[in-house]
């Protein structure tokens, strides 16, 4: 396993932002209470996006940031607790959406 490296990263977030003030209109809480206990001010909610679409967007950004061609990728590795399907895996869907060689490892 020599020569394996992460040369770039990318990120993608859903468009829908849910603030603590938004939550306070739904449940009995407020921004100060949530922020003091969690440090969280905003969170992101998927409406149109999927785990796969966000992973593809982030992967595309990582490839662009690294300045490498997608054909240089030797594996697709995805870690998530919010996959879109039980099967196929998010990694396999990303592999397909990016047009990567079907022979590379995807998990």
Annotate each predicted stretch with a short phrase.
Residues 75-80:
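Short glycine-rich or small-residue beta-strand-to-loop segments that form or flank ligand, phosphate
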Residues 35-37, 41-53, 81-107:
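Conserved catalytic cysteine-centered active-site region
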Residues 1-74:
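Conserved active-site "lid/cap" helical segment
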